[in-house]
Amino acid sequence: MPLFNGTLFQIDQKEMMRYAGLSPKVKEFPQDAIDSAIREALALAEPRGIWQILPYDPENGTIGGAHPLTLTGRSILRHLSHAWSVGVLAVTVGEEIEKASGAHFKNGEYLQGLLLDAAATAAVEHLADQVDALIQREAARSGQHTVWRFSPGYGDWPVTQQPDFCRAIGAETIGIHVTDHAMLSPRKSVSAIIGISQCSARPAPAKCRACGLMSCPFRNL
């Protein structure tokens, strides 16, 4: 169960602005506020990750390992239909960023709170990309290919499977817990699964294009 102590040297400003619900075309937005939020996020982030490769039975949709899990939802089963093993991962940037963001809002510093929250989201997605790349490299060493990562709540994969999925990953090892409402805590955390097979790798679609939540304010097509 490899641990990943990632590093964050930068945060994608374009992604950060998207998560903040701000168009990159808005030229008059104060750059110093953006830069300040990025600096604060980088200073407060506590990047941690965990991942492992587990056997997978595509006929039954079951992940093997110490805590076997049978997946439900047509979209995830279809996504993994050619996989005989899967990479599972969980990452977090810790809770200090969300505490700081909450403090900004509490003090009436709404812009700072919004931008810091968005920077944290961009940061944890970047961390997930790093672990995703590790799994891709591990699969390639045995001549296998991966498909893009998929998280509980995508498509019709019910988020209610989050507790069992995180147990299969071992997410508690890096301080990630699941709330009674199946949300991850710390809030700026990600869990995901990546199919591994002999099939040629498929290009990853735009993240939003793969999601059916048409009303999402972060949607970017």
Task: Give, region by region, the residue ranges found by the protein language model.
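Active-site helix-to-loop segments that bind/position phosphate- or nucleotide-bearing substrates
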Residues: 1-112
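Short N-terminal helix-initiation segments at or just after the protein's N-terminus
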Residues: 26-30, 138, 157
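Conserved active-site and cofactor/substrate-binding residues in soluble primary-metabolism enzymes
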Residues: 29-32, 36, 122, 126, ...
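Structural signal for hydrophobic packing residues in well-ordered secondary-structure cores
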Residues: 38-45, 135, 139, 212
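Conserved mixed alpha/beta catalytic, RNA-binding, or beta-rich assembly cores of soluble enzyme
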Residues: 83-147
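Short terminal or interdomain "cap/linker" segment that borders an active site or interface and mediates
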Residues: 142-217
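Short cysteine/histidine-rich zinc-coordinating motifs and their immediately flanking basic loops
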Residues: 220-221
